[in-house]
């Protein structure tokens, strides 16, 4: 029995599912989750001292790699003064200034929270408070955290009220969220024609990445902006995952900044916290000043703007200049090409969706454009692929519905390990369970 096996058995006794977030439990791929004891640069080391090349990056935040010396120094300096003040701090101000400056005029102010869930929840409350309307429009497969308003799935018909996607979410709450198939601008138009005067906001990921990466249809986000504004609603662009990762200005920098439109509100997370609990809502001064204490829409948090998290985020953003993004994009190009070549060589049907340095590998022979098509991938083949990759020293997300993340810490030696590991994983996906241990069935 491995140390991870022993720790997981203990964890199951005191933590639901043995984890603090469901995907970590390996339920979709089988087997025992590996417990991590340290990470440095592009590598993860588990409690059994096995080393992996990291292609998860803590689900996105570790864009400059783990334990980068400049980030570590900034955090140590911050915690030496205290782990929390519960009061304004200079580092909080400097991070706010950096986020606003990087967005190039798209936002004037930010409000920090501790998680992406809180950030989107705050943005939704703000939109409802400003418009005095109840409805939110989201898209099936887009994840905006686990607040009650967003744990819904679409019913049949364009204007179907949301149904709770989790026990504990009252139907009355879910009923104020309408979930539509992603990419169907015709259904958005139909909904607004019928109920546009009730909609507070459309909430969308700039690039969906929580059902796997989905490439937005040409002009889709701009049309969402235009439709919302034509009916007096707001557009909330959730960039918790994509913000400051896809480009210096996130997904918006690849789309809206070039096309001449701007969402009303943004949400950020992951990268801006440098791996620590931090997220934010951003927008124009006119909208953001509806938040207390300037305005009537309430939001608060004891640890919001935590100095250690702000220090980590500020140091991380400072590392990500234009050259760093160019290097990151080039690395992602190479890794995605390796995955494509390995699966092609093994004869495994697959599709790779990619935007900038973010991509997903779907084991299916059909285009993946929304949650319905993503759900048709071969999850059993992915389980074989995942475990063979893990054995070969690759740290992948334990689900076929996730993005692959690269960091600037990946080097040529890492890429050789990745290439070899992906070929082994592809062969396992093609051959079935015969080459795997029984525990992984």
From Swiss-Prot:
It comes from Propionibacterium freudenreichii subsp. freudenreichii. The modification N6-(pyridoxal phosphate)lysine is found at residue 270. Homodimer. GO terms for cellular component: cytoplasm. This is Glutamate-1-semialdehyde 2,1-aminomutase. It is found in: Cytoplasm. GO terms for biological process: protoporphyrinogen IX biosynthetic process. Its main location: cytoplasm.
């Amino acid at each position: 029995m491995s140390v991870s096996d022993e720790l997981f058995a203990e964890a199951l006794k005191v933590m639901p599912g043995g984890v603090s977030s469901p995907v970590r439990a390996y339920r979709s791929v089988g087997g025992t989750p590996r417990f991590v004891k340290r990470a440095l640069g592009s590598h993860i080391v588990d409690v059994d001292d096995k080393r992996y090349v990291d292609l998860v990056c803590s689900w996105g935040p570790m864009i400059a790699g783990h334990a980068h010396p400049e980030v570590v120094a900034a955090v140590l300096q911050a915690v030496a003064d205290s782990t929390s003040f519960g009061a304004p701090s200079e580092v909080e101000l400097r991070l706010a200034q950096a986020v606003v400056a990087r967005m190039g005029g798209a936002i004037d102010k930010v409000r920090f929270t501790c998680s992406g869930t809180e950030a989107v929840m705050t943005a939704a409350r703000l939109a409802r408070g400003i418009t005095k309307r109840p409805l939110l429009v989201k898209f099936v497969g887009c994840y905006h955290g686990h607040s009650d308003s967003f744990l819904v799935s679409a019913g049949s018909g364009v204007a179907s009220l949301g149904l709770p996607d989790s026990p504990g979410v009252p139907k009355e709450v879910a009923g104020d969220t309408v979930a539509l198939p992603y990419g169907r601008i015709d259904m958005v138009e139909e909904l607004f024609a019928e109920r546009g005067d009730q909609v507070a906001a459309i909430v969308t990921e700039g690039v969906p990445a929580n059902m796997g990466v989905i490439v937005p249809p040409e002009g889709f986000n701009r049309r969402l902006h235009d439709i919302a504004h034509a009916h007096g609603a707001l557009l909330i662009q959730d960039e918790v995952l994509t913000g400051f990762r896809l480009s210096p200005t996130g997904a918006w920098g690849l789309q809206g900044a070039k096309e001449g439109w701007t969402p009303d509100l943004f949400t950020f997370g992951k990268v801006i916290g440098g791996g620590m609990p931090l997220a934010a809502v951003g927008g124009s001064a006119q909208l953001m000043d509806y938040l207390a204490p300037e305005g009537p829409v309430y939001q608060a948090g004891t640890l919001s703007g935590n100095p250690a998290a702000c220090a980590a985020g500020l140091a991380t953003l400072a590392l990500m200049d234009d050259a760093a993004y160019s290097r990151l994009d080039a690395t992602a190009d190479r890794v995605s090409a390796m995955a494509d070549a390995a699966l092609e060589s093994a004869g495994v049907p697959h599709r790779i969706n990619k935007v900038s340095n973010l991509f997903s590998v779907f084991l299916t022979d059909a285009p993946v454009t929304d949650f319905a098509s993503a759900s048709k991938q071969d999850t059993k083949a992915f389980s074989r692929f995942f475990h063979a990759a893990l054995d070969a020293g690759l740290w992948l997300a334990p689900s076929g519905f996730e993005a692959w993340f690269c960091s600037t810490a990946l080097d040529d030696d890492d890429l050789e390990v990745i290439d070899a590991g992906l070929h082994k994983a592809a062969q396992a996906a093609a051959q079935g369970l015969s080459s795997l241990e029984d525990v992984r069935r």
